[in-house]
Amino acid sequence: MNSSQDNLFAKPYEHVSDFQFDDKVAGVFNDMIRRSVPGYGQIINTIGDLAQKYATPNSKIYDLGCSLGAATLSIRRRVEGRNCQIIAIDNSESMIERCNENLSAYVSETPVELVCGDIRDIKIENASLVVLNFTMQFLAPSDRESLLKNIYQGLVPGGLLVLSEKLYFKEDNIQTTLDDLHLDFKRANGYSELEISQKRSSLENVMKPDTLVEHENRIRAQGFSQFSVWFQCFNFASMVAIK
C-alpha cells in the first residue's frame, strides 16, 4: 500500500483548518497513521486473525470508516473460501478511490463492496464481524450509541465487533503521562514540534475521544455479552465485543 511521506503540517500556517480526510490526507494517510498511531500494524494484522476466527460462511463483514482499506485487505486474506461479502464504507471520496486501487492490486475470490457514504446511514445485517478502526472518535458523541445499536442488531449471535480508538483519561496525571509518551513516539518517527502542534490544533475540534469506561458502558448497554481490551499502547486501544 503505497503512500507519500506526510509533511502536511511541516510549514507554519497562519490559520490551521480543521482536519479533513481530503485528497491531501488520503495521499499520505498510510505514512501518517503508521507514524502517529503506536501498534497500528499489529492492530491491522490482528483484525485479520480475528476475521479468520469469527467470520462465518455466507455472512457479511463491515469495515466502517475503511480509509485506504488496510483492515479490509487484512480481513479478505483470511476469509477466503467462506463465501463472505465485505462491505467497506467511508465518507471520503478520495479515500474510497485509493482504497479501490489498493484492493484491485490483489486477486481475491472474496467480493468487496465499496460504499462512499455515511456509516450512520448504513443498515448492518447478517454480520459476523464489524470493524470500527479509529472511526468512532470522529463522530459526534451523540451519534455513537445509535451506531452501536445498529451494529448490535445487525450482528449474528456470536458475532464480533472490533473497536479501535484513541482514549481519554480523566485522571490528569495518567492523561498527561500517556499523552507525553505518544508525543515522544511521534518525535521518534520524525515529526517536528511544529508538525505535532499544528496537527493537534487541526484535530482539536473534530476528534473527541472517550474514556475506556465510557466505551465499555456504551457497548454493554446495547446487549453485548462479552467485552475486552485486547491491545493498548499509551492512549490508543483496540477492543472486542461479542454478541
UniProtKB/Swiss-Prot annotation:
EC supergroup of this enzyme: transferase
Binding site for S-adenosyl-L-methionine: 40, 65-67, 90-91, 118-119, 133, 200
N-terminal signal peptide: none
Family matches, as SUPFAM superfamilies: S-adenosyl-L-methionine-dependent methyltransferases (SSF53335)
Reaction(s) catalysed (UniProt annotation): prephenate + S-adenosyl-L-methionine = carboxy-S-adenosyl-L-methionine + 3-phenylpyruvate + H2O
Enzyme Commission number(s) of this protein: 2.1.3.-
Gene Ontology biological process: tRNA wobble uridine modification
CDD domains tied to this protein: AdoMet_MTases
An MF annotation (GO) of this entry: carboxyl- or carbamoyltransferase activity
Record keywords, A-Z: S-adenosyl-L-methionine, Transferase
PANTHER family per UniProt: CARBOXY-S-ADENOSYL-L-METHIONINE SYNTHASE, TRANS-ACONITATE 2-METHYLTRANSFERASE-RELATED
Quaternary structure (record): Homodimer.
Function per UniProt: Catalyzes the conversion of S-adenosyl-L-methionine (SAM) to carboxy-S-adenosyl-L-methionine (Cx-SAM).
Family: Belongs to the class I-like SAM-binding methyltransferase superfamily. Cx-SAM synthase family.
UniProt protein name: Carboxy-S-adenosyl-L-methionine synthase
Species per Swiss-Prot/TrEMBL record: Shewanella pealeana (strain ATCC 700345 / ANG-SQ1)
